[in-house]
A protein has these predicted regions:
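Short, active-site-adjacent cap segments at secondary-structure transitions
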Residues: 53-57, 101-102, 210
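Amphipathic alpha-helical segments at domain termini/boundaries
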Residues: 1-17, 153-194, 202-219
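Hydrophobic/aromatic residues within transmembrane alpha-helices
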Residues: 48, 107-108, 166, 185
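Glycine-rich beta-to-alpha active-site loop
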Residues: 82-130
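Catalytic-core regions built around general acid/base machinery
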Residues: 34-37, 77-89
Length: 219
């Protein structure tokens, strides 16, 4: 599994992969390292994207099954990444070209904007059906980004939202055909590229302070 960083002009493109792109410890390490690179290289904005059937399928359940004694550490690691994305000091957009489930859907919500493929892929929180309650931090993140109506619909039903449904309820900001998802995300961010990073970071930390505190408060 290799995550790659490229640029479109001054906008960083973080490529998550072409498989299920689950959140293994290696995946999380690479993601964080590339965020560091994007910042150090002077990116004005960032888009995350994946190739194939999945944007990401979320938590690495196989790794968790084999390392049950490290569950607390792992959840803390995932939530630290969500908190960082939520407050990244640049405009961000998730280009969702495939399925986005569970923690991956939370990662998408941690971006400032979301563009979803119109004709394929589902956005879903399956936790209610797989009997895994949301942590306080994860619930706080979702509720910070969605209206109460959308949060209840997404969190308590296990509903799989297609692109049009996700846009209608406010989960994503736009939809596009397969070959236009990335371009739409880039166009969304391009006018925002000259915003001051320190100011953006400060605003996000204030806006999402409660969610960030809950994400970082892992026992």
């Amino acid at each position: 599994m290799t995550i790659a960083l490229s640029f479109s002009d001054t906008i960083a493109l973080l490529h998550l992969g072409d498989d299920e792109n689950r959140f293994s410890p290696e995946f999380l390490d690479q993601f964080e390292a590339h965020l560091d690179d994007a910042i150090s290289l002077g990116a004005h904005a960032l888009v995350t994207v994946a190739t194939g059937k999945f944007y990401s399928n979320g938590l690495d359940l196989d790794w968790l099954a084999a390392h049950g004694d490290q569950t607390g550490w792992y959840v803390g690691r995932v939530q630290a990444l969500l908190a960082r994305m939520l407050t990244l000091p640049m405009p961000t957009a998730a280009a969702i070209g495939g399925h986005s489930f569970g923690a991956a859907a939370m990662l998408a919500l941690a971006h400032d904007f979301r563009v979803m493929r119109i004709d394929r892929g589902y956005f879903c929180f399956p936790e209610v059906d797989i009997r895994i309650p949301f942590t306080p931090g994860m619930a706080a993140l979702i509720q910070a980004k969605l209206t109460p109506q959308a949060a209840v619909s997404a969190m308590t039903t296990g509903r799989r939202f297609g692109g049009a449904e996700a846009e209608a309820i406010g989960i994503v900001d736009a939809t596009a055909k397969e070959d236009a998802v990335i371009g739409t995300a880039l166009n969304m961010l391009a006018p925002l590229g000259l915003k001051d990073p320190g100011t953006i970071g400060a605003i996000k930390n204030t806006m999402f302070g409660q969610a960030v505190a809950a994400l970082k408060a892992v026992s």
